[in-house]
Amino acid sequence: MQQVQLKLKSFDPVYINQLISLLNDVLDTLEIQNSKEIFLPSKIKKITVIRSPHIHKKSRDQFQIKRYKRSMIISFTNIDILHAFLEICKDLHVVGVQIHISVKYHS
């Protein structure tokens, strides 16, 4: 049995939702029912910048970058379906989403 873990990262949750729905459609066409989605905690990075270069040091701007993360775990029993799924994932070009794929093999 093979197990694939997809880690998805994005700055916009809409892009992750689009990719998840696309992957669920691919899994439905390949007739795979052994998948689960895990919501991971989002990270917030805050940056503070001084507005003025010379005076008024108390005047500051604050920005934040929020990174959303999800994980999908999919179990495969047939190696040919696994190869087909990995080829489809390789050809996916979703803007704004970073995909990390790890494959585990259980004998």
UniProtKB/Swiss-Prot annotation:
Superkingdom of the source species: Eukaryota
Main localization category: mitochondrion
Ribosomal protein among keywords: yes
Keywords: Mitochondrion, Ribonucleoprotein, Ribosomal protein
Keyword Ribosomal protein: yes
Gene3D superfamilies attached to this UniProt entry: Ribosomal protein S10 domain
Signal peptide bounds: none
MF terms in GO: structural constituent of ribosome
CC per GO annotation: mitochondrion; ribonucleoprotein complex; ribosome
Record localization: Mitochondrion
GO biological process: translation
Family of the protein in this entry: Belongs to the universal ribosomal protein uS10 family.
Protein name: Small ribosomal subunit protein uS10m
